[in-house]
């Protein structure tokens, strides 16, 4: 977050201060801080004012509860049995939750894709 524009850094710090991580979501699972990092990196890229091709992205968290709901999908269980145990299944349900819950004003699908490719270790390669 070191190289973010000042306005984005202030918004990131404001949100990060008010939205704590969930204790049950430890590495390798994705937490609030991981998603916020990815979101603000994308926000910085897609609102770059030095470029001729500026995209007008609405920056900000719409609902911390919706983001928590999407993140909580990773640890869903019933009767002591976790619903998702395979890393691909966990990544898929997280992707679905981030896309469908619309926790951010804009950039939900981009954030979901970045999170899943980065943290699953499956980077796309040009071939």
Region locations from a protein language model:
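FIC/Doc superfamily catalytic core
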Residues: 1-127
């Amino acid at each position: 977050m070191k190289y973010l524009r000042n306005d984005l850094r202030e918004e990131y710090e404001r949100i990060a201060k008010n939205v704590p991580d969930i204790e049950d979501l430890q590495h390798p699972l994705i937490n609030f801080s991981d998603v916020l990092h990815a979101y603000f990196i994308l926000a910085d890229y897609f609102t770059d004012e030095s470029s001729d091709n500026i995209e007008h992205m609405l920056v900000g968290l719409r609902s911390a509860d919706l983001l928590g709901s999407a993140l909580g999908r990773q640890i869903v269980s019933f009767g002591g049995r976790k619903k998702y145990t395979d890393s691909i299944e966990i990544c898929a349900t997280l992707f679905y939750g981030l896309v469908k819950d619309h926790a951010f004003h804009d950039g939900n699908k981009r954030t979901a894709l970045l999170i899943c490719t980065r943290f699953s270790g499956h980077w796309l390669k040009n071939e």
